From Swiss-Prot:
Family, per entry: Belongs to the alphaherpesvirinae HHV-1 UL47 family.
Protein name according to UniProt: Tegument protein UL47
A Pfam short name: Herpes_UL47
Chain span(s) of sequence motif Nuclear export signal: 647-670
Motif Nuclear localization signal, residue range(s) on this chain: 63-75
Annotated Gene Ontology cellular component terms: host cell cytoplasm; host cell nucleus; viral tegument
Organism name: Human herpesvirus 1 (strain 17)
Compositional bias (Basic residues): 63-75
Domain of life: Viruses
PTM (free text): Phosphorylated by US3. This phosphorylation is required for proper nuclear localization.
Reported function: Tegument protein that can bind to various RNA transcripts. Plays a role in the attenuation of selective viral and cellular mRNA degradation by modulating the activity of host shutoff RNase UL41/VHS. Also plays a role in the primary envelopment of virions in the perinuclear space, probably by interacting with two nuclear egress proteins UL31 and UL34.
Region listing for Disordered, in residue ranges: 1-32, 48-126
């Protein structure tokens, strides 16, 4: 680096050599901490491993006092004779290192460590007793969105008998769960997932109309359309903030919503309903297969996270890092003996074929298909619709404020709130993966009695806590409930819309998980397998959309922090790693979109609808504003109070200070190249080109 470069750039590209968490680590699978991490995250690439290695290396090294020859001789004479042998074992030669490396990793990719007893025992929440949690809650922490409750109140009851063949969403192919073919007999599979009984509960045209109606939404905050719309003006898209940052320029917001629909709902509908003529029943078969694959991956990742490293002891620093991450994760696997169908192998890949690729694409937008939502029952249908609508509005609002060619227009308060949103989304997604892993295990092993299976069927747990988890309400309150967060919400229109989207996902996931618990039946209610299956599939739909929205937030965080130079975005210490683990487990359900790919898609959408970004404000008569104050009123009950005062997210760190972790875990190869170009002083080519003349 040249001495003439400004100090700020030297801080961005530190010349400090990266420290290794374990001394003399061999280049192979390794021993100690890196051997443990490779056992946990072995897969398509080593990005998680490299980032975690830097997490250990970023900690300040232990200071050692320099000793002279006399002091070293005195210390050596005072040491016991066995210390020399112990030291020689700590510094093995190449052959010994290779042998320890082999012993310290799994023999092959299909073998999964069974983990220590504390990882195998316990229920849905791990070692925490759900009954003890219920005793501490005292009251319900589930606070559904008032807008959702209003929509649910006006939703008519299901009328499956009145749905004709022409309204059923197209031809129905025989349902199947590909990953379980040959492993589960047909009758048992149909009992676990009765896909053949999932007939449409309402007419598709009816659900399509209802998705375009949003009670309580003023002009400017449009609901999800059924098809691409031309309400936005073409030409220049102005990104300057209004004088009052609590509102949006109406024209820019409409243009952002047009872009959002083009890359989400319109993209999935164009690829399925219009081009390939895929039926909603095929989408549901894919969803069931993807959820089972996800459950397997969630079990494998959780087991590896809690497994003891074999072949070597960890040093103190590495052991503490491992302990902290294992204690923070929500992935608490059920014992292998209880779920043999989940624990029979290692990580599974996504379903192959063009249809599966389409269903995993478009930022997780499968729930925007009215024919798919029509297959759900009333509560799950409204929950999926509401989550889709609010995340669509939030995506449009983000695209009305963030653009690679107008980064200067982003406000500090907007950049600061993004990290808080990502924190909550990562915890929600991780807890949903854990829930799906447990409920799928319970469905596939109906004769196994396990505390975790009993917990997910415990209605009072899911009435008391969203997703039945104290960690979710803890993360929500920690990120969005303090004074600084409330101030950010009140003083920014974008932050209000983002908060409403998080609240909608909270409401939707709480609704469908409670629906599953009720469908499991009790002494006063019959078991309803079809309703339970619909709840599981609805959770998969909402999780897929949550992941697409989270990738949108990640793209905006990286744009603000790395291309815009903002230091305001902060995240919990383990949020990048937590979200990367979720993305690894959910690959069968969702094809992630890196920031570089996201902005390339946005640029293509802007060219399609003829929009050109500019860092200016619109002039009269198109300078009217839209106020999301109605969402602030909706957010009054959110977030609920936490169950305990402990931290779920860990210490907050600035994104610019952990850019190497962000780059390796969340940005992908193209984003990494863009970041390197930006740090070196050249334009971040992966994040957009100059505006068109």
């Amino acid at each position: 680096m040249s001495a003439r470069e400004p100090a700020g750039r030297r801080r961005r590209a530190s010349t400090r050599p990266r420290a290794s968490p374990v001394a003399d680590e061999p280049a192979g699978d390794g021993v100690g901490f890196m051997g443990y991490l490779r056992a946990v995250f072995r897969g398509d690439d080593d990005s998680e491993l490299e980032a975690l290695e830097e997490m250990a290396g970023d900690e300040p090294p232990v200071r050692r006092r320099r000793e002279g020859p006399r002091a070293r001789r005195r210390r050596a004479s005072e040491a016991p004779p066995t210390s020399h042998r112990r030291a020689s074992r700590q510094r093995p030669g190449p052959d010994a290192a290779r042998s320890q490396s082999v012993r310290g990793r799994l023999d092959d990719d299909d073998e999964v460590p069974r983990g220590p007893p504390q990882a195998r025992q316990g229920g849905y929440l791990g070692p925490v007793d759900a009954r003890a949690i219920l005793g501490r809650v005292g009251g319900s922490r589930v606070a559904p969105s008032p807008l959702f409750l209003e929509e649910l109140q006006y939703e008519e009851d299901d009328y499956p008998e009145a749905v004709g063949p022409e309204d059923g969403g197209g031809a129905r192919s025989p349902p199947k769960v590909e990953v379980l073919e040959g492993r589960v007999p047909g009758p048992e599979l149909r009992a676990a997932f009765p896909l053949d009984r999932l007939a449409p509960q309402v007419a598709v045209w009816d659900e399509s109309v209802r998705s375009a109606l949003a009670l309580g939404h003023p002009a400017g905050f449009y609901p999800c359309p059924d098809s691409a719309f031309g309400l936005s003006r073409v030409g220049v898209m102005h990104f300057a903030s209004p004088d009052n940052p609590a509102v949006f320029f109406r024209q820019t917001l409409q243009q952002g919503e047009a872009l959002a629909w083009y890359i989400t709902g319109d993209g999935i509908l164009d690829l399925t309903d219009r081009r390939t003529k895929t039926s909603p029943a095929q989408a549901m078969s894919f969803l069931a297969d993807a959820v089972v694959r996800l459950a397997i991956n969630g079990w494998v990742c959780g087991t590896r996270l809690h497994a003891e490293a074999r072949g070597s002891d960890l040093d103190d620093r590495a052991a503490e890092l491992r302990r902290q991450f294992a204690s923070l994760t929500a992935l608490r696997p059920v014992g292998a003996a209880a779920v043999p169908l989940l624990s029979a192998g290692g990580l599974v890949s996504p379903q192959s074929g063009p249809d599966a690729a389409v269903f995993r694409s478009s930022l997780g937008s499968l729930l925007y298909w009215p024919g798919v939502r029509a297959l759900l029952d009333r509560d799950c249908r409204v929950a999926a619709r509401y989550a889709g609508r609010m995340t669509y509005l939030a995506t449009g609002a983000l695209l009305a404020r963030f653009n690679p060619d107008a980064v200067r227009c982003v406000l500090t308060r907007e950049a600061a709130f993004l990290g808080r949103v990502l924190d909550v989304l990562a915890v929600m997604a991780e807890q949903t993966v854990q829930w799906l892993s447990v409920v799928v295990g319970a469905r596939l092993h109906p004769h196994v009695h396990h505390p975790a299976f009993a917990d997910v069927a415990r209605e009072e747990l899911f009435r008391a806590l969203p997703l039945g988890s104290p960690a979710v309400v803890g993360a929500e309150h920690e990120a969005l409930g303090d004074t600084a967060a409330r101030r950010l919400l009140a003083n920014s229109g974008l932050n209000a819309v983002l908060g409403a989207a998080v609240y909608a996902l909270h409401t939707a996931l709480a609704t469908v998980t409670l629906k599953y618990a009720r469908a499991c039946g009790d002494a006063h209610r019959r078991r309803d397998d079809a309703a339970a299956t619909r709840a599981i599939l609805a959770a998969g739909l909402v999780l897929q959309r949550l992941l697409g929205f989270a990738d949108t937030v990640v793209a905006c965080v990286t744009l603000a922090a790395f291309d815009g130079g903002f230091t305001a975005p902060e995240v919990g210490t383990y949020t990048p790693l937590r979200y990367a683990c979720v993305l690894r487990a959910t690959q069968p359900l969702y094809a992630r979109t890196t920031p570089a790919k996201f902005w390339a898609d946005v640029r293509a959408a802007a060219e399609h609808v003829d929009l050109r970004p500019a860092s200016s404000a619109p002039r009269a008569p198109v300078s009217g504003t839209a106020d999301p104050a109605f969402l602030l009123k909706d957010l009054e009950p959110f977030p609920p109070a936490p169950v305990s005062g402990g931290s779920v997210l860990g210490p907050r760190v600035r994104v610019v200070d952990i850019m190497s972790q962000f780059r390796k875990l969340l940005m992908g190869d193209e984003g990494a190249a863009a970041l390197r170009a930006h740090v070196s002083g050249r334009r971040a080519t992966g994040l957009g080109g100059p505006p068109r003349p």
